[in-house]
Amino acid sequence: MHVIRRMTRVVSTVAMVAGIATPMAVEAVRATPSAASVNAGSIAIGYENNGADPSIISVANKYFQREMGHDVRLKLFTSGPAALTSLASGQLPFMCGLGMPPVIAAIAQGVPLQVVFNQERYTKDAGLVVKTSSGIKSVAGLAGKSVGLVIGSQSSFELATYARKAGLNLSSVRLVNLTPPELQSAWATGRIEAAVVWDPVYDFLVTHGGRVLMDDSKLPVTATSFNICVANKSFASKHPAVARAFVKALGDGVSYLQNHRTAALGVMAKAAGISVATAKVEIAGYQIYSVSDQATAAVLGTSSATSATSGTAQSLLNNWRALYRAGTITTRTPKSAGPFVNPNYAK
């Protein structure tokens, strides 16, 4: 799944993320990189600013360079759909911070992607926010209202799930397709009365005249929103050591959060352009997965043979069914999502 709180401040802050000079970042630069990237060439990694998130620690502290070599280029995207062209062209062998729908859209178009790291499950950091002045009291009350969302992202799936449970026909809702920064602006100008979005814009709406109507904690695990990292299957199979180093770098971010929580909150706040207090609230709204969690039944599966029954694969299938029903994608849901989930690089 996911982007900008104080727009001008954050855009400039995030643009400099790769050069943030925290003590840990300096240490990471001085460390000898692994040999994983030998013969792999220049490596591009895409990511999103999802607010307080362990992957932003890996970016800020230069763990990708430490684990994969110095010839790593980081590219910021404002949303998952915005990254699809680069993913489809093969320019990005790795991408983080994605929701399921953009990944499904890419796979449906024949892009050889696999989920290699499930970063976290949203619980309190994403959902449906309504303006207190709108008079909307329930999901059914969205009929005739303007709702902002990133069509083709996790927000499409969440809104469809909320609507189905409430018996709301989405054809009665005025859907406004916006990027997260545009969504924040539309909220401020009164163009929309409700929104389905994730942090940090989610928190902005809540603190600027919004009320949470539904959040992801109300959804079952297999229907909820995840931030996931994908690899180009062709690239990763040719360079498995690079893929393992990529996963290791992500795990380093989680470990830093677990072992240096106060410092980690400061790193995430600076990188995401938010306050430490906000970072603390946001990180509490996730169920975060470490490297050791990846190869378990609840996350990616214990092996390639069991990946199809993993929590991530089941969520992917449920997202796919919802997107197909909504007409967002025209490719029928496959019988199994096992081929699109790979726990082996986390072992």
Enumerate the predicted regions with their spans:
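Sec/Tat-exported extracytoplasmic proteins
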Residues: 67-68, 91, 96-99, 107, ...
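Short, glycine-/small- and polar/acidic-enriched structural segments
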Residues: 33-169, 174-177, 193
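Short, low-complexity disordered leader/linker segments with a strong preference
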Residues: 1-42, 347
